[in-house]
């Protein structure tokens, strides 16, 4: 074990009982959140193995770190392990979970293991319906710029680090807090961020929005009395919750009553410029290397966290200006030459109507002269059903729309909540005539006829559409890379 690993194996240092844990097994190890925690643990010196249904970039990276990866779930693969980590996406009848219980091997949720990593560190937990990955990445980048050398666990690839997780040589742990299954209630951070609260993952909350809101309050009350809640006052639901939070609160937003306020927002292509206003100090000019008002809010959250920790403005401003982005968050994949001219290709993970609307707005602001062509893959039948009218309205705002089949994420189809239904409803609005395609082959043959010179082509969604964007970027359409 390297000196850094030995020095910062804090689970063993602070919890002597963790010394009896030598081999940790992850079921569903290829997920971004699961893989991130696995990477931190293997760098702390634990033996790691795990399984998933297919290889991906996460499993390939973990293999390079010495993690044993199994493709497919089989009962014998958990034999000899000391603890099994699982996400709530894994079915209770999974043979590895069944075997672990029969063998009396402890089974813990992903968030429980993250909570153990955070227990003896200065934890910063970022929660909210949208913006978690970007905000967490910005905070981690600022702390790295300030030589705080944080440990971080992020739900997307931080381009500057080449990974979504890293074991740092300090007391700081910066991580996303997942409300989708209410597992963020396991966390006990020193700083909690709430970016916004909207109806999503409502099956977890029995369709009760009030229960979702009260769960966020419970999350904030996991802070110690000396902790800090950083909250976006621009979000109406977050603003409503402020009087109910019995902890120190720092607010941020464009609103005049925000503690950390942005003024004079201007977007220039990919970058966003604004004036930062805080009580008791001079205004300063800030540029964040991300497009859109929503990303200014994410930057304000990171500034609020850093300011509370007395990080110098110089490090904050430099980190935001030099930010290299996150995989699949308005990720520019290049400009390509087609038979009809040049096309700019952007890939984005957003899959909630508000996220898609923010992406469209950023594209319009940064590239107002470009025709916006979107390939959208709905994510989950339940989300499409619950937010159907919002999707119809938002998707009608592009110039050309191509709809792929719903990425089910394991859900059974819901009648009337599929892409063909969306196509019909959008067409009935009369703003544009969407195109439904049943598969990748049909799409790839269609695109050369659809695209025009100067287009901005946006691949949008949380399913496997990211693979499709790479297919396009790898010249499968006969494109020639220009930049």
From Swiss-Prot:
Q: Which residues form the signal peptide?
A: none
Q: Where in the cell is it found?
A: Cytoplasm
Q: Which domain of life is it from?
A: Bacteria
Q: In which pathway does it act?
A: Cell wall biogenesis; peptidoglycan biosynthesis
Cellular component, GO annotation = cytoplasm
Keywords assigned by UniProt, alphabetized: ATP-binding, Cell cycle, Cell division, Cell shape, Cell wall biogenesis/degradation, Cytoplasm, Ligase, Nucleotide-binding, Peptidoglycan synthesis
Catalyzes what? UDP-N-acetyl-alpha-D-muramate + L-alanine + ATP = UDP-N-acetyl-alpha-D-muramoyl-L-alanine + ADP + phosphate + H(+)
The record, for Pfam families, names: Mur_ligase, Mur_ligase_C, Mur_ligase_M
- Where along the chain is ATP bound? 128-134
Q: What is its main location?
A: cytoplasm
The EC number on file is: 6.3.2.8
> One GO molecular function term?
UDP-N-acetylmuramate-L-alanine ligase activity
Biological process per Gene Ontology, one example term: peptidoglycan biosynthetic process
Write out the similarity annotation. Belongs to the MurCDEF family.
Q: Which PANTHER family match?
A: UDP-N-ACETYLMURAMATE--L-ALANINE LIGASE (PTHR43445:SF3), UDP-N-ACETYLMURAMATE--L-ALANINE LIGASE-RELATED (PTHR43445)
Provide the function of this protein: Cell wall formation.
Specify the protein name.
Answer: UDP-N-acetylmuramate--L-alanine ligase
* Highest classification ranks of the organism: Bacteria, Pseudomonadati, Pseudomonadota, Gammaproteobacteria, Alteromonadales
